[in-house]
């Protein structure tokens, strides 16, 4: 069981995700991104088996309150999973570039090819996924490995050593097949060999 510290970027999908994680047996505590990074770090210190989940939300990753600072502080110290906007923030935190996807995608089902990483264990490729985004990772830094794509667009990334992964799509959507399994796999992977550091500097 994970203790999930959930960063809410003021998004309508937040409680769908929270309900999904709770139905998988995890404890979820929600913190909005208008809190300070210091306050969230202090909350993390109280948790066993912590995993930080970065929610979807409106706007650009740089406009998400404490989230960019929090990512810089926590990467390599706590496992993290980013979804949509959270995924884009992960890409930027590791030095990548997020820009316009060329079209606005709102509620579109796409067939995604994945690389059989552990987060996709037991899942078919291609996999039907739900997309709601206008931005996409256009330059992925060497610290991140692309694990899935749709027509050359990056749909997920991981940093294996830091136990950080990002999904551009929405696993919690009813339009994503096997979404619950994907989220369960992601938590299992995040906790499988967590980063060695346990203290926040």
From Swiss-Prot:
It is an enzyme of class 4 (lyase). Keywords: Amino-acid biosynthesis, Aromatic amino acid biosynthesis, Glutamine amidotransferase, Lyase, Tryptophan biosynthesis. It holds the Pfam family GATase. The active site is at residues 84, 170, 172. L-glutamine binds at residues 57-59, 88, 134-135. Heterotetramer consisting of two non-identical subunits: a beta subunit (TrpG) and a large alpha subunit (TrpE). This is Anthranilate synthase component 2. The lineage of its organism: Bacteria, Pseudomonadati, Pseudomonadota, Gammaproteobacteria, Vibrionales.
